[in-house]
Amino acid sequence: MKARLQTSLGQQLVMTPQLRQAIKLLQMSTTELEVEIAEAVETNPLLEWADEAAHAASDIAVDSSPSASTEQPQREEVAPAERDEDWSQDELQWTGSGSGGSFDDDESGDAAERVAESETLADHLLWQLHLSPLSPRDRQIGAMLIDALDEDGYLREPLSAILETLALGAAVDEADVLTVLHQIQRFDPVGVGARTLGECLALQLGVLDADTPGRELALQIVAGPLERLPRSGVAGLAHELKRSTADVEQAVQLVRSLDPRPGKQIGDLSQDTYVVPDCVIWRQRGVWRAALAGRAQPKVTIHRGYENLIRSCGESDAGYLRGQLQEARWLLKSLEARGETLLRVVRCLLEHQAGFLEFGAQALRPLTLREIAGELGLHESTISRAIARKYVRTPRGTIALRAFFASGIDTDSGGEASSTAIQAMIRRLIDAENPRKPLSDAKLADLLKTSGVPVARRTVAKYREAMNISASHERVRIA
């Protein structure tokens, strides 16, 4: 057996502070993003809104002499394409493949539409569950597990209690429940479905690249009793694990960057809220096009004259300003990555679901997160974050991006029909029924089968109930 050295090229995902910031911005809605950027502009002296900078530059040009203007700090809007040496776009694994786009319309009025949204953590997970390739039995188990999660995303009940609640008999054992739980633990946000804090952190570490610095040691730390960390400190933990203090410090910093309450990432909007579209879709000369809405890309600028500001300060203040400058650059790059990723996803959805926009829900094709992730070369969790609480304005109105995804059922013609399309077909049949003799679920199933879409009666009943349509005996109307 010979020892040999091998070298290989590849990309690795390192959970740097700037990457964590980019992930955080990606999963925000436009309204949340505006609040986040406003706070950054308020706290970072090197950031400023573009319109304020342009106004200040105009005042300088009109009111100042050429000699005086050189003494004023100049400002520029940092172009999205500007790169920082210590943080490349490749590190995000979200690089855009071409030109971006924005639709800078006036969205202060009608564009901010008031819609009812009440997405909870359970809603978010159930949506992913229905898109997963699971059997009806496993989906039932999954729904029960999701219902048992607390607001932080943890499963506090033992699997044996879940099994008793299911009441599926001897056909299901605890191992089956555990298998479905592992599937849920792969959903977004990463870390949900954990039974302990250590398991929650381990799940988040598990999605990082194997070469992430400190990952293996961090997994070892979270596998033990976490309460020993503040008690022992880094030095004590290094002695206990027989590792260097530097290695342990690196691993501890990685652990601290994780989210101990992943369920909180999904807000519970129990009341009506204003929704600002993130993208705009329109048809031009027979071709569907997409662009970012103006408010989806907050226009933030950075002072060009920051070097003069730093030179005029003392050493301690100059160090502070350098740190603020680095944070400002990271923020601008995170905004660029968010916009590029969102636009790539929307344009990919357009390629698959143009029929949905032209003809409505009955033309919606089966489409999963995995398919889009595979085409774009991204992780499923990235796609999930990119579409979470995101909306697109279309000729059919403002639509949630998640509405472009649907599970599918095989048809007699060898293709697939999405669950959304089947629901639209059921609604159309019911709308056209004789009010004196409403169609039963069995009759609806027969009519769908005649149309080449074989579905069981119980499936029809499930879809009908999901649309809040009463059973046939309750729909009887006497003229």
From Swiss-Prot:
It comes from Xanthomonas euvesicatoria. Belongs to the sigma-54 factor family. InterPro entries: RNA_pol_sigma_54 (IPR000394), RNA_pol_sigma_54_core-bd (IPR007046), RNA_pol_sigma_54_DNA-bd (IPR007634), RpoN_core-bd_sf (IPR038709). Residues 73-82 have a biased composition (Basic and acidic residues). This is RNA polymerase sigma-54 factor. PROSITE patterns: SIGMA54_1, SIGMA54_2, SIGMA54_3. GO terms for cellular component: DNA-directed RNA polymerase complex. Keywords: DNA-binding, DNA-directed RNA polymerase, Nucleotidyltransferase, Sigma factor, Transcription, Transcription regulation, Transferase. Residues 59-115 are annotated as: Disordered. Sigma factors are initiation factors that promote the attachment of RNA polymerase to specific initiation sites and are then released. This sigma factor is responsible for the expression of the nitrogen utilization genes. GO terms for biological process: DNA-templated transcription initiation. A motif (RPON box) lies at residues 456-464. One of its GO terms (molecular function) is sigma factor activity. The gene is rpoN. Residues 368-387 bind DNA. Transmembrane segments: none annotated.
